[in-house]
Amino acid sequence: MEDCLIEDQTSFYSEAEHYWKDVPPTVDGMLGGYGSISSIDINGSKKFLQKFLGEGQGKTGTGCALDCGAGIGRITKRLLLPLFRTVDLVDVTQEFLDKARTYLGEESKRVENYFCCGLQDFQPQPERYDVIWIQWVIGHLTDDHLVEFLRRCRSGLRPEGLIVVKDNVAYEGVIPDDVDSSVCRDLNVLHRLVARAGLSIIYEEQQQNFPEEIYQVHALALR
């Protein structure tokens, strides 16, 4: 839907890369000045994710997770490393990944890969991941690239694996953001793109207790 709003895909991606290169490699930088919401976000994500993890029929394993648009590793440090044996990070900004190695501290030894790559070009290793976590980054992909990326993520899942998309949700339609060269989609648009990727939404909920002035944030569990 938003592809008609994007006149030049090349500049759409290059301008986003340029924006993030000027962002300080801090939690506050990763959250656009809203570093204070990090704990609320992580706690909500942990409750969401733990509904699916465990042993037995239909449960998602805890071997390896992928953090997409990982930045300095905020989600890896506080959500994924406490729950998974190993984690991979992928982000388009090398400076953030370099910072992640120190930000993660001693636990960085359980990070197996730091991939510097835009998600439109990233190819997850087949059947490697129990969980692929995609937060606050899908707005940097065009519709077609998001669908293609989700399809590649599906092939990167282990049996009973899970894709989680957690992101801002517009009230209606698609809203472009010229500051960071991204878009914000409403739920109907997002649901259609998920279906195009051949995935099903098995659970969805809205993040609670965020400031009123920011977009609603929804988490979707996909298989």
Curated annotation (Swiss-Prot):
<dbReference type="GO" id="GO:0008276">
    <property type="term" value="F:protein methyltransferase activity"/>
</dbReference>
<dbReference type="GO" id="GO:0018013">
    <property type="term" value="P:N-terminal peptidyl-glycine methylation"/>
</dbReference>
<dbReference type="GO" id="GO:0018016">
    <property type="term" value="P:N-terminal peptidyl-proline dimethylation"/>
</dbReference>
<feature type="binding site">
    <location>
        <position position="69"/>
    </location>
    <ligand>
        <name>S-adenosyl-L-methionine</name>
    </ligand>
</feature>
<keyword id="KW-0539">Nucleus</keyword>
<protein>
    <recommendedName>
        <fullName>N-terminal Xaa-Pro-Lys N-methyltransferase 1</fullName>
        <ecNumber>2.1.1.244</ecNumber>
    </recommendedName>
</protein>
<dbReference type="GO" id="GO:0071885">
    <property type="term" value="F:N-terminal protein N-methyltransferase activity"/>
</dbReference>
<dbReference type="GO" id="GO:0007059">
    <property type="term" value="P:chromosome segregation"/>
</dbReference>
<feature type="binding site">
    <location>
        <position position="74"/>
    </location>
    <ligand>
        <name>S-adenosyl-L-methionine</name>
    </ligand>
</feature>
<comment type="function">
    <text>Distributive alpha-N-methyltransferase that methylates the N-terminus of target proteins containing the N-terminal motif [Ala/Gly/Pro/Ser]-Pro-Lys when the initiator Met is cleaved. Specifically catalyzes mono-, di- or tri-methylation of the exposed alpha-amino group of the Ala, Gly or Ser residue in the [Ala/Gly/Ser]-Pro-Lys motif and mono- or di-methylation of Pro in the Pro-Pro-Lys motif. Required during mitosis for normal bipolar spindle formation and chromosome segregation via its action on target proteins.</text>
</comment>
<dbReference type="GO" id="GO:0005634">
    <property type="term" value="C:nucleus"/>
</dbReference>
<feature type="binding site">
    <location>
        <begin position="119"/>
        <end position="120"/>
    </location>
    <ligand>
        <name>S-adenosyl-L-methionine</name>
    </ligand>
</feature>
<keyword id="KW-0489">Methyltransferase</keyword>
<dbReference type="GO" id="GO:0007051">
    <property type="term" value="P:spindle organization"/>
</dbReference>
<dbReference type="GO" id="GO:0042054">
    <property type="term" value="F:histone methyltransferase activity"/>
</dbReference>
<dbReference type="GO" id="GO:0005737">
    <property type="term" value="C:cytoplasm"/>
</dbReference>
<dbReference type="InterPro" id="IPR029063">
    <property type="entry name" value="SAM-dependent_MTases_sf"/>
</dbReference>
<dbReference type="Pfam" id="PF05891">
    <property type="entry name" value="Methyltransf_PK"/>
</dbReference>
<feature type="binding site">
    <location>
        <begin position="91"/>
        <end position="93"/>
    </location>
    <ligand>
        <name>S-adenosyl-L-methionine</name>
    </ligand>
</feature>
<dbReference type="GO" id="GO:0035573">
    <property type="term" value="P:N-terminal peptidyl-serine trimethylation"/>
</dbReference>
<comment type="similarity">
    <text>Belongs to the methyltransferase superfamily. NTM1 family.</text>
</comment>
<feature type="binding site">
    <location>
        <position position="135"/>
    </location>
    <ligand>
        <name>S-adenosyl-L-methionine</name>
    </ligand>
</feature>
<keyword id="KW-0949">S-adenosyl-L-methionine</keyword>
<dbReference type="InterPro" id="IPR008576">
    <property type="entry name" value="MeTrfase_NTM1"/>
</dbReference>
<keyword id="KW-0808">Transferase</keyword>
<dbReference type="GO" id="GO:0035572">
    <property type="term" value="P:N-terminal peptidyl-serine dimethylation"/>
</dbReference>
